[in-house]
Each structure stands twice: as C-alpha cells, then as structure tokens.
Amino acid sequence: MATEGLLSAETDQDVARFLANFPPTEWGYSFASLLPQDSEFESHTKELDLVKEKVKDMLMQSRKELTENIEFVNCLCRLGVSYHFESEIIEQLSHIFISLPKILEENDYSLYILTLLFRVLRQHGYKMPCDVFNKFKDSNGEFKKCMTADVRGLLSLYEATFLSVHGEDILDEALAFTRQHLETLAEKSSPHLARHIRNALHLPFHHAPERLEILQYICFYEGEKSMNETLLKFAKLDFNRLQLLYRKELGLLSRWWKDINLTEKLPYTRDRIVEAYAWAAGIIIDPQFSRARLQFAKHLILISVMDDTYDSYGTFDELKHFTAALQRFTFEPTIELPEYMKFLYNILWNFFQETEKDETQGCACKTSFAREMLKELARSYFAEAEWYNDGVLPTFDEFMQFGLVSSTFDYHASAFFLGVEDLGMKEFIWLRDNPTIAKTAKLFGRLFNDIAIREDEQKKGDYPSAIKCYMNDHDVSLEKAKEDILKMLEDGWKDMNEELMKPTTVPKILTKFSINFVRMSDFTYRGGIDKYTCGTELKEFVKKLTIFPLQI
C-alpha cells in the first residue's frame, strides 16, 4: 500500500491535525552496510583474553595494600572492565567492609583515599558511614579551607556526595562546598585535569551513562602520569570489542527497520532507530545481553511511533478507537480505524506474535505480560489526549498517576525481561508490585522529559505536562516549578541510592537496569534539550560508541 493510500482518507476529509515537523534523521546511511565479520570479533576476544590474565594478576596482587587495592578496583570500574572480575571484586570489597571499623581506627587516610573508599564501597552496595568526613571540618563545623589545595581529593569528595541517602547532611554540605571550589579550580588546573573536572561538574560519574563515562575516563586515564599501560590496553581492547558487537546489533536493527517500512508508511513519525539503539546500549551495557538490547530498541522505536500518533497526528476520535482496539488486541482491528492506524496496529500485532512464537526462549508468558504493559501505556497516552481534547488541566497528582506510566519504564522493563532468558514471571511480579526503585525510575523518566518539552509541543497549546500542572496547583512561575521539580529529582536520587544498599531483595540485574534507565533519562533531557528527538545532540556519542575505535 502506498503512503498516499494510508493517509489520503484523512486528507480528503480535511481533518485538522497537529504536525510536529520532527527534524529528519541525522543518519544518511544504513548501519546494515557496516556489519562487522564474526572473525573480527573473535580476533578481538582472543587478544583481550591474553591481556585479561595479566590484569587479573594485578588485581589479586593489589590486595596486599588497601590504598592500592581500592585505587585498582576504582580504575577497573571507571575503565569499564570490572565486569570481567566481578566475583573477585565483590569478595575483596566484602572483606574490606567487614574490617572497616578496624581499618579506619588504625589508619589516617587522606581525603582522596577516604572518599574513593567511600564511593567504591557504596556503588557496590556497601553502606560506609558518612561521618568519616567529620575529620575534614574545623571547630566551627565548616569544611577546612585547606582542602581546596587538594584538587583530586576535592573532586573525589564531590563524586562521593552523589551516593548519599536521606539524612546525610554532611554530604549535602560537601556537595555545595566542592562544587563552588571546583568551578574556580577548573580555571587554574592543567587542560588535562580541567577537562576532567568540567565533565564531572556537567554530569557526575554516578549520574552519567556508563558507556559515555567509560569513554571519557579512558581518555583521561591515558594522560595520567600513574597510568598502567597494561590496564589501559585492556580497557581499549574491551571498548573496541564491544563496539564491534554494538555495530553488529545496530546493523541488524537497521535491517528490521527497513523491512517494516514505517517511515514511508507513517511519515509523520520520528525516524530514530539509531537514537533508540543508543538508549538500549546505554541502559543494557553488558555484552551477554545482545538479544535484550535488540528487543529493547525495537520496543522503543514502536512506542515512539505510538507516542507520535497520540501526541502529534491522531484525532481524538481516532485515538479513542485505537486505544479500544489495543485493549482487545485481537487479530483484526476495528473497521473504525483509518488505514494508517490499521497499519500501525498490524505492525504491533505482528511484532508481539513473532515474540510469542519464540518458544525456545520460553517467552510466551512473558510476552503476555508485556502486552498488558502496552495496553496500560495506551490508556495512559489516551488519558493525556482526553485532557487536552476537553481543555482540562489535571492536578499534579492526577497527571502523575498516568504520567508515571507514560514514562515508559514499566513497558521497557518488560521488553528487557523478554530478551533475558534467566528472567521470568518472578521479575514481572516484582515490576507489577511497583517497588521503590521502579517508582523512582518512573518519576525520573516523566519529570526529565517534561522539563525538556520541545517548542513544537508548546505550540500545541495546553497539552498537560507535569510542569504546567505543578504551576497551576501551586500558583508559581515556570522557573519556580522547575526548581521544585529538580528538588524532587535530587530526593529521587537519594531514594535510588538507598535501594542500592545491601541487604536488598532486588536482583542486581534489575537494580542496574533501573539506575541505567535513570542515567539515560538524565543524559537525554539534561539542559532542557530532548536529545532523542533532536538527534544532532546524540550523534557524536553514537559515533564514538559504534563507529570509531580507540587507537591502541
């Protein structure tokens, strides 16, 4: 069916539509033409394995001295290669944490080492107490001014503050103190260190997407006087090997996208397969989850099309029938749907049918749950469309009831579960029960998005958003509403951090997915720009992630 055939009925009826005029894709070529050979990946793996044994020996040798051990573990984490030695690292950190009272009593560590120890333990779930930083305060309860002479120690303290939980006032004070002085110190430092400081001030390590942070740290580490050549080579080999895997996955995704032909059939929607894959790789970073990344990216692309249909093209009556059809989700959609919606409906139907047929991975019951998430998402999208159609601005709480669903966290978590064989109904039940870490991730997904509402969305008029509802509820300005919502997000990070601390009943794979979803939401909408829609903002990140290898 030609494009004109799908959309002509609406044109003939002269239906008034809001057209968002999304920017075209930034990618003028298909990644399907850039598929690497399997032999290339195997060659990288062999070379990596040779160096891996040397790095493992270094890790085991570092146990003799705590400062050396914690610095080496930190390097492994920040260079993106700690997953190779996960069991060894957990064993070492567990031993340190158990012995921590004695260690702190017998040693007077520097600001740099103490903050590094604090951050590394906390990022692995060990809740080291924050009162260890009282030693850096003067008799007036203020942080000592002499600390500003230790630039690396100050930067390490700054990074440590982002792992705080509620009630840790000293870390809130430390954040304000370090941020103020680091902004000045960046001007006085060497270009090498200044760039590292500015990257941290823009997006701290704990909040940054892992692959972006890893790339930045490899570049920084290469310029360090204390750089270990073997460790640097290992990190670069690992980065380049994963890059080949990511490029292969993006090539397969490009073929799928070409086959379903959505941009020709539905030209009003965003063509963002590369950006969708960047999200998948930013959230699901471990190499063994290739299938999960592809599942996630495909679901994200289809949900983007649905979102554009609800927000930017469909009429209210069309959306009403489309939502009802999705609630039934049978083979034949209702005849009341226009042709373009029937096409979209059939794409969704066929996609879920193909997933459900994959019995070898035991997906049938998981696909059923994901289908229910799709129905819930459609109801949420329609509720927002109904408010707009009726000229109703809901309260902030009413909006968030549906807005947390339209954050898409639940839907994308279910897509992730579909791609991981070891995850089953137990994890879906966890998601359905709405634990704190999931609620927090949804809060971030919704509020970050609404802070970065595009100008074309603003032109649509009183389309509800969290910002507008909050302004109306509290009779405050746009600036004040954003300030208050950013405070909610700061508190949300503390909630998230608390959920990461041991003991926890949540499997690590789920906490990692949740926090990486938050990191990608933060990165995508930081600065008030929707980098997913405005693809220029993500282009360099994607190139570095998938195209340009690091020189070894």
Curated annotation (Swiss-Prot):
**Name of the molecule in the record:** Terpene synthase 5
An example of a Pfam family matching this protein is Terpene_synth_C
Cross-referenced InterPro entries, in alphabetical order?
Isoprenoid_synthase_dom_sf (IPR008949), Terpene_cyclase-like_1_C (IPR034741), Terpene_cyclase_plant_C1 (IPR044814), Terpene_synth_N (IPR001906), Terpene_synth_N_sf (IPR036965), Terpene_synthase-like (IPR050148), Terpene_synthase_metal-bd (IPR005630), Terpenoid_cyclase/PrenylTrfase (IPR008930)
Task: State the organism named in the record.
Answer: Ricinus communis
The sequence motif named DDXXD motif is recorded at: 307-311
The processes (GO biological process) annotated in the record are: diterpenoid biosynthetic process; olefin biosynthetic process
Q: Does the keyword Methyltransferase apply?
A: no
Q: How is the cofactor bound?
A: Binds 3 Mg(2+) ions per subunit.
